[in-house]
C-alpha cells in the first residue's frame, strides 16, 4: 500500500502537465521558445527546493504532505511546458537533414536525468551516508542538486538565441488565433495522441516502474536492481542518437512501425520472461532488448510531432496532446501495475501495456512519414 501511495503522488505531477503545456505552450508560440523554457525551469527549481526543505509530518502535521503536493504540482506544470517548448526549439534549430539525430540527443537528456538521479542515489547509499542518515535527511540531497541544476539551466537558457523559424513566423502568427489554428489542425492533435499512447506507457514501464518491478516481482536485491537499471539506462542513452540518425536516412515511419510491431508481439513474453528470471545479467539483457524496441519511438518522438505542425502553434500542438496522453497512459503506469500485482494478476498489466502499443501501431500504419511531409517551414 505504501508503494501505491507513493505512485499516486508521482502521478499527481502528470495530472498537472496538460495545464502546464497550455500555459507554457501558449507563451512559447506567442512570445518565443527561449522565454518559455526559462520560466519553465524556474518553476522546476522552486518545486525541487520545496521538496528539499519541506518539514516532516511530525513537525508540521498535515501541512507536510500538502507542501509535497504543491511542489509536485509546480514540477508537473514545469514538465508539461518543458516538453513542447524544448522539442520545438531543438527541432527548429536543427538542420533539416539532422533533425532525427537532434531528436535522439533531446531524448538523451530525458533518460540522462534519470541516470543522474540514480547515480546520485548510488553515491549517497554506498559512499557517503548510512541507511539511517539517508532515511532521516539524505533523501533531500537529490532535490537540492536538482534545484542547483535548474539554476544552471536557467543561466544557460538566458543566453540562448530565439529560433529563426519563430522570428520569421512571428508577425504572421500574431494575426491569427492560436485556438482557431489548433482547431484547424485537430487531425494532427489526434495523431500526436495516437503516436504517444504506446510509447509513453512503454517508456515509464521500463524506467520508473522497472526498479520496483525488479525488486518486487523479479526478486533482485537493491544493489542488483540499481546496477541493472543503471546499465540499461546507459545502453538506452547510447542508442538514442543512433536511431535518430537512422531516421534521417530512411525516414521516421519505419522506426515507428518497428516499435509498434515488435512492442505488440514482444511485450508480454519479454515481461513474463523477465519476471521468471533470477539472474541480474539476464534481467539486464532483457531490459536492453526492450530498449532496442522502445527506442524506435523515443529517439524520434520530438521531431515526428514537431514536423506535424506549423510554427505558429508548434509548441502547443506538440505539448498539449502529449501532456494529456502522458498523464493518462504514462503517469498511471505504476498505479495500474501495482494494482494488478496486488490483485494477484500481474500479467494483466503486461496485456495492458501490449494494448497501448497496439493502439499506437494502428496510427503508425496510417501516418505519413513526417520527414517527407514536414511542416517545419510553414508559418501558419
Where are the predicted features?
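Multi-pass alpha-helical transporter architecture, strongest
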Residues: 153-160, 304, 354-380
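Cytoplasmic membrane-interface "Motif A"-like loop-to-helix N-cap segments
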Residues: 30-42, 249-260
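Helix-to-loop junctions at the C-terminal end of transmembrane segments
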Residues: 20-33, 240-252
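Extracellular/periplasmic helix-loop-helix junction of adjacent transmembrane segments
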Residues: 1-19
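Glycine-rich segments within core transmembrane alpha-helices of 12-TM secondary carriers
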Residues: 78, 100-125, 149, 320-333
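C-terminal transmembrane helical hairpin of 12-TM major facilitator-type secondary transporters
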Residues: 253-300
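C-terminal ends and interior cores of transmembrane alpha-helices
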Residues: 42-61, 261-277
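Extracytoplasmic gate region of multi-pass secondary transporters
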Residues: 186-235, 329-334
Amino acid at each position: 500500500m505504501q508503494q501505491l501511495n507513493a505512485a499516486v503522488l508521482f502521478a499527481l505531477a502528470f495530472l498537472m502537465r496538460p495545464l502546464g503545456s497550455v500555459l507554457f505552450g501558449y507563451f512559447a508560440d506567442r512570445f518565443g521558445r527561449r522565454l518559455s523554457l526559462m520560466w519553465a525551469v524556474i518553476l522546476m527549481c522552486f518545486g525541487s527546493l520545496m521538496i528539499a526543505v519541506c518539514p516532516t509530518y511530525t513537525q508540521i502535521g498535515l501541512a507536510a504532505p500538502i507542501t509535497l503536493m504543491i511542489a509536485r504540482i509546480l514540477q508537473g506544470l514545469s514538465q508539461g511546458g518543458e516538453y513542447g517548448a524544448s522539442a520545438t526549439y531543438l527541432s527548429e534549430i536543427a538542420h533539416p537533414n539532422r533533425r532525427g539525430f537532434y531528436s535522439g540527443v533531446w531524448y538523451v537528456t530525458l533518460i540522462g536525468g534519470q541516470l543522474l538521479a540514480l547515480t546520485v542515489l548510488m553515491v549517497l547509499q554506498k559512499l557517503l551516508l548510512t541507511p539511517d542518515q539517508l532515511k532521516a535527511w539524505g533523501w533531500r540531497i537529490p532535490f537540492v542538486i536538482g534545484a542547483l541544476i535548474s539554476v544552471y539551466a536557467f543561466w544557460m537558457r538566458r543566453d540562448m538565441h530565439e529560433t529563426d523559424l519563430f522570428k520569421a513566423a512571428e508577425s504572421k502568427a500574431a494575426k491569427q488565433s492560436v485556438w482557431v489554428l489548433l482547431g484547424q489542425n485537430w487531425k494532427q492533435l489526434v495523431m500526436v495522441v495516437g503516436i504517444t499512447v504506446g510509447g509513453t506507457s512503454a517508456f515509464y514501464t521500463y524506467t520508473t516502474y522497472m526498479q520496483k518491478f525488479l525488486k518486487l516481482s523479479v526478486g533482485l536485491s537493491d544493489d542488483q536492481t540499481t546496477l541493472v537499471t543503471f546499465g540499461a539506462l546507459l545502453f538506452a542513452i547510447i542508442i538514442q542518437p543512433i536511431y535518430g540518425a537512422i531516421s534521417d536516412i530512411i525516414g521516421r515511419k519505419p522506426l515507428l512501425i518497428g516499435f509498434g510491431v515488435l512492442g505488440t508481439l514482444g511485450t508480454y513474453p519479454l515481461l513474463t520472461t523477465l519476471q521468471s528470471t533470477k539472474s541480474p545479467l539476464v534481467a539486464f539483457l532483457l531490459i536492453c532488448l526492450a530498449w532496442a524496441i522502445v527506442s524506435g519511438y523515443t529517439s524520434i518522438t520530438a521531431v515526428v510531432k514537431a514536423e506535424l505542425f506549423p510554427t505558429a502553434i508548434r509548441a502547443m500542438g506538440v505539448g498539449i496532446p502529449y501532456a494529456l496522453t502522458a498523464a493518462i497512459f504514462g503517469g498511471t503506469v505504476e498505479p495500474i501495475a501495482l494494482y494488478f500485482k496486488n490483485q494477484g494478476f500481474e500479467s494483466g498489466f503486461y496485456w495492458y501495456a501490449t494494448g497501448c502499443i497496439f493502439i499506437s501501431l494502428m496510427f503508425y500504419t496510417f501516418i505519413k512519414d513526417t520527414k517527407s511531409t514536414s511542416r517545419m517551414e510553414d508559418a501558419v
